[in-house]
Swiss-Prot record:
Position of the signal peptide: 1-19
Name by which UniProt lists this protein: Urotensin-2
Stated role: Highly potent vasoconstrictor.
Domain of life: Eukaryota
Keyword Transmembrane attached: no
Pfam families: Urotensin_II
Subcellular location: Secreted
UniProt keyword terms in alphabetical order: Cleavage on pair of basic residues, Disulfide bond, Hormone, Secreted, Signal
Similarity annotation: Belongs to the urotensin-2 family.
GO cellular component: extracellular space
Record InterPro entries: Urotensin_II
Positions of the propeptide removed during maturation: 20-106
Organism expressing this protein natively: Sus scrofa (Pig)
Encoding gene per record: UTS2
Keyword Secreted set for record: yes
Length: 121
């Protein structure tokens, strides 16, 4: 009898929940989706800020250093911050060059007879 009361309450709540109408999501687009141009502008700002936060890479030549190359312009934000945004070139190019320096060289293992698929003994 003590389990019957909670079960009836649960069924009563589920009945009310199932009585609510469910909108068909295929007919209407989501109301909070942003336009494409706003998303692309946001992605560009994120890339530029990521490049500014990257630490200097060890062993980089003086001419290739991002902090020494003045290939950008200053942008003032409402909070009083000042950041530098790159102009003229895609920030992905700089990021790929930085990541290529950090990448470890591929190290070949022993003869192929000792390896099965990608696991070597």
């Amino acid at each position: 009898m003590s389990k019957l009361v909670p079960c009836l309450l649960l069924l009563g709540c589920l009945g009310l929940l199932f009585a609510l109408p469910v909108p068909d999501s295929r007919k209407e687009p989501l109301p909070f989706s942003a336009p494409e141009d706003v998303r692309s502008a946001w992605d560009e700002l994120e890339r530029a800020s990521l490049l500014q936060m990257l630490p200097e890479t060890p062993g980089a030549e003086a001419g290739e250093d991002l902090r020494e190359a003045d290939a950008g312009m200053d942008i003032f934000y409402p909070r009083g911050e000042m950041r530098k945004a790159f102009s003229g070139q895609d920030p992905n190019i700089f990021l790929s060059h930085l990541l290529a320096r950090i990448k470890k060289p591929y190290k070949k293992r022993g003869p192929p007879s000792e390896c099965f698929w990608k696991y070597c003994v």
